[in-house]
Amino acid sequence: PNRQQQVSREQLAEIEAKHIAHELAFSDAVSGKFVATYCNYKKDIWALGPRLRPNRRGGASEQDNEERIKQRFAMSEKILNIRQKYYKEYSKFLTQTQIEKVYEQERMLMKRHAKRGKKMATPK
């Protein structure tokens, strides 16, 4: 892809937030709060560092595998804590139904990004 077409992850988070706000027909005031909160949420997630991937190569010792599993548990716990923190933030200006729909939209976007990533990874 053209370098000018590449979007920073901060810009992508803002685009995602605006898309979700538009899809859920938030008012301008709520949209502004949502976009800012969603972008902060994404920054907190990114601050955790890269996701730990399972060892697909094999050959790792039992101890290595145990350590990797424990690291993934720790990462999952940190992500859960961040999600709970932002759930409380969203609850200040969104209804519970709206929050549920935000999570649904977020899952749909993640699936779409995963599909795009696979398409780009496959040789033509």
Where do the language-model regions lie?
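Bacterial Sec-dependent N-terminal signal peptides
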Residues: 1-5
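Metal-dependent catalytic neighborhoods of phosphoester/phosphodiester hydrolases
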Residues: 8
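Amphipathic alpha-helical segments
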Residues: 16-93
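Amphipathic, charged alpha-helical segments and their helix-to-coil junctions
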Residues: 80, 84-124
